[in-house]
Amino acid sequence: MSNSIRYISLEPVNLKTTYSEYDTIEFDVIFSGRKLRLNNIRLAADIATPNATPTTGDLRTKNTINDFQLDPMVGAHSFIDSISTEFSNAGKNSGTVESLQEYPRYAKMYYAGTQTMDGQMGSACACELRCPSMKCSNVLLRGGQAGKAAAQVYIPSNPHELANFSVRPRFLLNSVSSAQGEPMLSERQVGSCRISIRLSRFSNVFNGAGAIADITSYSLANVRLLYQTYADDGTDMPLVARTKANIKQNVNGNAITLNARLPIMANSMTASFFPVEDMNSAQKNTLALPEPPAVSRLEFSFNDSTNSYISYELRDKNSILQRAIQSLNPMDETNAVSLDMIKSGDMYMIGLGWESFIDLSRQKFSLLLNSGIGSSATDYTLYSYFHGILEM
């Protein structure tokens, strides 16, 4: 019996009936005498809005609030504004080992650069409220109905279930590999583990005209962390986790420079832009990846692991986008997206991958961008994410 899998449904430390925008939810993951199965940690919850009741669902009827949705590529990941991981064990990996801010935008960039919209139709996406279109997202938010004919699905008097989700966040404990097989983490390696999640503001979760006129807030109920543990066999696997660190800055000139020093061993970076004037608009999709005006030159420069100066200069859009796609999978993971697909989806990113890992706490990474932003009507925010590793 001791070797059996245990399926854990963990309540938050700061337990409440519901959580809303800006709330922090904390989970203490304790697995004494057991091993934590990595890459399978999920956040689950029910979604409620002021209009939601047991008989109306989240969006009431088909003809009411039909312009209200999540970003379809991000789905319920958009509820997670930030996620951090903290280990209690004394040693090189004690304290906060990853603190990923602006998480929904990272999720959007990752899925936009690695998956097609058709790939969003599987069951693994549906449970995360990820889907192929805005219209589909609107339907998912209405809540489920069982045993009803298609023509009756949107009748207000028919009982609905509240929409719910189960997402696998792309954070440190879900991004681990081991040469010895499926990665398992023992308490000896890290001690106890605390996962802290801060919820996004309403305008960064939902978008559409209905997000202004009809629904202006949300809450999450029955929030829980789902994971599995196995009996501890007394051995510790060497583990390597993919980790992320991010920074953002305002861009208001035709020539801008980003100089980054971050506590991460990185081998790639990816970035995207968004107009400052639209950042707080619930009507706009704040996770969109628009192209800034008149980008004419992009240059990356840094010293590599041998302290040799490296510089990459890109001038045409195809080269810029191709490098960005490659930067999301620097370890040669599967990538279903082609350059034509990301261009046709009106999604713009910049990025670069390089051959060896560099310590960005000691080496400065620089980015120079020439564009027409300074001559445009609005400033932009540049969101930069650096991808690295952490040995556990």
Regions picked out by a protein language model, each given a short descriptive name:
Residues 1-392:
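Short, low-complexity Pro/Thr/Gly
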